[in-house]
UniProtKB/Swiss-Prot annotation:
Cofactor: Mn(2+); Mg(2+)
Entry GO MF terms: manganese ion binding; RNA binding; RNA-DNA hybrid ribonuclease activity
Upper taxonomic lineage: Bacteria, Pseudomonadati, Pseudomonadota, Gammaproteobacteria, Aeromonadales
Record protein name field: Ribonuclease HII
EC class (word): hydrolase
Domain RNase H type-2: from-to ranges: 9-196
Residues annotated as binding a divalent metal cation: D15, E16, D107
Amino acid sequence: MMIDIPEDKLVAGVDEVGRGPLVGDVVTAAVILDPANPITGLADSKKLSEKKRLALFDEIKQKALAWAIGRASPEEIDELNILHATMLAMQRAVAGLSITPELVFIDGNRCPSLPMEARAVVKGDSLVAAISAASILAKVTRDAEMTELDSRHPEYGFARHKGYPTPEHLAILAERGPLPAYRKSFKPVRHALGIE
């Protein structure tokens, strides 16, 4: 069940992917959908098959009025903490839009500081079509980055666990130690570095 969107306002949806992983950027996306060019099948990216996500990824980029990716690096995550780095990445995604929205719906329970009206929507990736679209862009983008990292470091298994702290990943991290792309403020990485 999608929530009603004001028809007289230019609305963007924003979502993030990658708060939990031990490695890589936190990736966000902002999307302004075109009401005259609807996209069927939008849903929370985590509930879609990879094949469906990839098809929707291309369709969203073609049909949206505007879209942008924002990110915060592992260094920024370590410096700011993951919550503040996520807010920064969301600000960057909104600032990257080629059209300025009048209203921004953010997935979750808090909004970054933005120069326009913003509303937090819990479970927004299932309730607001533009947030669903943003979740798909962010997830496909981040998954592709993990696959690329996997091609450079296949022994770490990034294509399988996408950087999340699975038992397999934690065992590899303990054995091989962290790469530069790891988030050094995250406890399992600190442990692998011998900091705690």
